[in-house]
Amino acid sequence: MSISADKIKELRSRTQAGFMDCKKALEESDNDIEKAIAWLREKGISKAAKKASAIAAEGQTTVVEKGDNCVVLEVNSQTDFVSKNADFVKFVKDVAEVILKNKSADNVDSLVLPNKKTVADTAIDLTATIGEKISVRRAQLLTKKKGQSFGVYQHFNGRISAAVLIDGEVSSEVGKDVAMQVASMNPKFVNSSQVDKKWKDEEEKLLIQKTIEEGKPKEFAEKIVAGRMVKMLAEVCLEEQPFIKDNGITIIKYLKQNKANKVLEMVRFEVGEGIEKQEANFADEVKAQMKK
C-alpha cells in the first residue's frame, strides 16, 4: 500500500509521533488517519507501560502565582535532555495552570488539561511519544489572605523552584529575595519555633558524641553542644539565616525593615531530590540493546 507523505505529515502533526511510527500506523490502518491515531495510542500505552518501572530523576520544577494562589510543581523525566523538549515544557506549564485553576494540588493526575485528557493520560501519551517515563512527582499550593504576600524564585532553568508566604504586604522584589534565600540556602525550617523535636534531639546526640570524641570532658559536653546548637539552628532556620545579599542582617530583620512580620510557609522543590538514581553500566546497556 502506498502511503502519501501528506498523510504522514498530518498524522505526525496530530500525534507528535515519529515518522516511521506514523508510516507503520497508516499501513496497519488502511491509510485511515483516525484508525492510525487509535493504533498509535494503543501501541503508545503498551510502550508507556514498559517504562512505568523506570526511574525518572531528571525533569523540571516550576513556580507560578496567580491571584491568591501559588503553585510549586515538579515533573520528572529520565534524562535532562528530555526536560528541554517543547512538549515536556508545555506539559509542565499546563499542569501548573490547571492546578491554579482548580485551586487544589490534591489528586493532580485526575485533573483535566486543555487537551480534554487527564494529567495521567497525557503523561502516558508523552511517555509513548518521547520514549521516556514522564510523571508528575509532587505539587504544593499556597494560598494567601489579605495582608499577606508571595515570594517566588526559579533557579537554573527550573532545576530549583521556591515560594514563600509572607505575613505582610511586600514588593515582589522583597518576596523574590526571600524565596531566593530558600532556593540557595535550603533551610530545613522557617524558624526555631518550628524545629522538629526528633530532628533536634538526634542532632544534639550526634554533637555530644562528636564533642566527647574530640577529647572534651563529658561533664562539659552538653554546655558546649548547647552553644553549637544555637549556631546550627541559625544555619537551618530561614528567618535566622544571614541574608545572602547582606550578611550583616538576618532574613527576619530584612522582613522587618520592609514592614513584614514573618514567613508563614516555604516550599522548595529541587529536581530529583531524594530519588536514588540508577548508575547504568554502558557495556551492560549495549548488551541489553543487542538482545532486543
From Swiss-Prot:
Region spans: Involved in Mg(2+) ion dislocation from EF-Tu: 79-82
Keyword Protein biosynthesis part of the UniProt annotation: yes
Keyword tags: Cytoplasm, Elongation factor, Protein biosynthesis
One GO CC term, this protein: cytoplasm
Stretches assigned to coiled coil: none
Taxonomy, superkingdom: Bacteria
GO molecular function, one term: translation elongation factor activity
Subcellular location: Cytoplasm
Keyword Signal part of the UniProt annotation: no
Main location: cytoplasm
One Pfam assignment: EF_TS
Family, similarity comment: Belongs to the EF-Ts family.
Function noted in UniProt: Associates with the EF-Tu.GDP complex and induces the exchange of GDP to GTP. It remains bound to the aminoacyl-tRNA.EF-Tu.GTP complex up to the GTP hydrolysis stage on the ribosome.
PANTHER family (UniProt xref): ELONGATION FACTOR TS, ELONGATION FACTOR TS, MITOCHONDRIAL
Record protein name field: Elongation factor Ts
Organism: Malacoplasma penetrans (strain HF-2) (Mycoplasma penetrans)
Lineage, uppermost ranks: Bacteria, Bacillati, Mycoplasmatota, Mycoplasmoidales, Mycoplasmoidaceae
